[in-house]
From Swiss-Prot:
GO process annotations (BP): rRNA 5'-end processing
Record keywords: Cytoplasm, Hydrolase, Nuclease, Ribosome biogenesis
Alphabetical list of Gene3D superfamilies matching this protein: YqgF/RNase H-like domain
GO CC terms in record: cytosol
Species, as recorded: Synechococcus elongatus (strain ATCC 33912 / PCC 7942 / FACHB-805)
A GO molecular-function descriptor: nuclease activity
HAMAP family: Nuclease_YqgF
Top EC group: hydrolase
Name assigned to this protein: Putative pre-16S rRNA nuclease
Biological role: Could be a nuclease involved in processing of the 5'-end of pre-16S rRNA.
Cross-referenced SMART domains: YqgFc
Enzyme Commission designation: 3.1.-.-
Location in the cell: Cytoplasm
Amino acid sequence: MPYYAALGLDVGRRRIGVAGCDRLGITVQGLTTIVRRDFASDVAAISAIAKERQVELLVIGLPYSMDGSLGSQAKQTQRFATRLSKALQLPITYVDERLTSFEAEEMIKAEGRSPSRDKGAIDRKAAALILQQWLDEQREPRRFGSTQH
């Protein structure tokens, strides 16, 4: 049985949603939302979580445009992810995160909560959806993805 030690990250301009999974990859949960200040602070916060959870891979949501192209936000996310990977000495892989924030917001509404009152909850749930999508892809017949270091 595979062993999973991954963090899911929903990287935004203001916040980073962080999600983790159990070692068997069965359950995924939002862990925290990091309010972004500068790169060093982002790295320190993610590093602390990664060390505590003995993470071996960062799964990062890549916000493709609806037509499948990489827009400016996706390119910024890639630049951040590359720097983060080097700083933490951890490999990264990307997951198409189109509509995860929208889906997360709808899930929060379905729970009877107000998404506008807790933007961090949306980010955490979006990160959980990103990580869940990656886990689901790992269970599919083997396809070689875009893992990079």
